[in-house]
Structure formats: structure tokens, C-alpha cells
Amino acid sequence: MAEITASLVKELRERTGAGMMECKKALVEANGDIELAIDNMRKSGQAKAAKKAGRVAAEGVILARVASGFGVLVEMNCETDFVAKDAGFLDLANEVADFAVANKGTTIEALAAQFEEKRASLVAKIGENMNIRRIQYLEGEIIAQYLHGAKIGVLVAGQGSDEELKKVAMHVAASKPEFVNPEDVSAAVVEHERQIQIEIAMNSGKPKEIAEKMVEGRMKKFTGEVSLTGQPFVMDPSQSVGDYLKSVATSVTNFIRLEVGEGIEKVEEDFAAEVAKITAGNA
């Protein structure tokens, strides 16, 4: 039996909106598998579609560079927001991004090796660990970039207007689509969601035949919600991104989005417990 930690229960609560006891029970039944627990809770009606995993916990910056026919995003992490604003840290991060765009196709391993000496020197000076975490390239006829406070970086590849593609990049930063078009959603993702929706419909007392018909409409909504062109445009929610792109004679072929610390869980200090520990030690 996997250990059901408080942090795991907390994550499930944040992602489903369900109560603590329901979340703990679901995790026990799923043997600690949070994704299975979410699926089971959705099937039983205890939770709606869960928020995508990826708690932003680490600090650092996202940098973007665009050259002819391609662009690159780089994530560099540190331990605190204070260091993320340090001039020395930012200088190194910008050096890394400049190297990445000047050496198209370089790997994260090559970047780490190239800047290891400077990184180690800065760690010794500042007294805080830091690392080059991710690098992603995007090719295209036109590449538009958008950075949101150095915490979120987006590159959008497409054809047409660079100005319009930048607006779409801002939308991607805000709405987090996973695919370009509804038809791009993988068969595995579609089938997984379809089975969940069928069970939800059947659990409401509907025969399987009727449940399957109900699911068709829900699946169309689902693929629209996770795809860029199917989402309501943040700058004009009365139309979809796809309709907006058609109106300005612009198209998107691909995009990438990085957010500082995605998937990294920061250790949360229990201040009261820490004070009690120190007090006991001084007694």
C-alpha cells in the first residue's frame, strides 16, 4: 500500500475541489495513484474535470530568443524569487539563451556542460542552487514570442501577420491549450475521456445507447477546450481563436509554452512546527 501523504491529499483537493476525506479515500482506493483517483472520482460524480497537473513551485525565469525561421525558450531555475531578480543570475540566464539561439538544436546536456563553470561560481557566490532546466525549439515561417513577467514564455509558429500571432501567443499564455486544433487531440486522450464520460452518463441512470449519444456532444466540447483554435479568444470571447485567425488571414502551425517551475514541488515549511522545534531545542 502506497503512503498517502498530506501533500498528496492537498494536491488532489486542489485539482478536484473535493473534500479532504473524499480525496483521502479516493487515494487509498487508487493505492496512491492520483491520476487514477481523479478518474474514479469523476466517474462517481465526486469531481469534475481536474485541473492539469503541474504545480508551479520553483523560482527562476523563462527567456525567449527568435532568429530566422526558428525560436527557442529556455528555463533557468533558482531557489528563491529574490535570486531570480539578481543581476548575476539574470546575466547568466541571458548568456544561456544567447548561446541556445546561436547554436540551434543544442541539447540541455550541452548547455549544462557549456555553462557549468559559471553556474558553479555563481552558486558559490550567492549561496543558492540554480540550474538550466529546460530548452525547447520551435521552427516556422513566422515565429511570434510573448513573455509574461519572465515567468511564462510562449512561441507561436504560423503564417500571416506577426502582430496577430503575438496576440495568439498572449492567449496561449493565459489559456494553456494543449493542441493546435481539435482534430490534433490524440486518439488515446480522446478515448480516455470518452470512457469517463460514458461512465458518468451511465451512472446517472441512462442506458448505454443513450449515454453514448450524450457523450458525442461532450467530446466535441472537450476537444474544443483543450485545443487552441477551439478555445474562446481571450481578447474577444464572443469568437473562437480559430474564427479570429480566419478573420485576420493568419494561421498557426504549432506553439510551445513554458512556465517557471512546472511539475516541481517546493518543500513547504511548517512555520509553527519549526518554531516549536527551535523552542524545544532551546529549553
Curated annotation (Swiss-Prot):
InterPro entries in the cross-refs: EF-Ts_dimer_sf, Transl_elong_EFTs/EF1B, Transl_elong_EFTs/EF1B_dimer, Transl_elong_Ts_CS, UBA-like_sf
Chain segments carrying region Involved in Mg(2+) ion dislocation from EF-Tu: 80-83
PROSITE patterns from the UniProt entry: EF_TS_1, EF_TS_2
Molecular function in Gene Ontology: translation elongation factor activity
Keywords, comma-separated and alphabetical: Cytoplasm, Elongation factor, Protein biosynthesis
Coiled-coil residues: none
CDD domains tied to this protein: UBA_EF-Ts
Chief location bin: cytoplasm
Annotated NCBIfam families: tsf (TIGR00116)
Family to which this protein belongs: Belongs to the EF-Ts family.
Protein name: Elongation factor Ts
Organism: Haemophilus ducreyi (strain 35000HP / ATCC 700724)
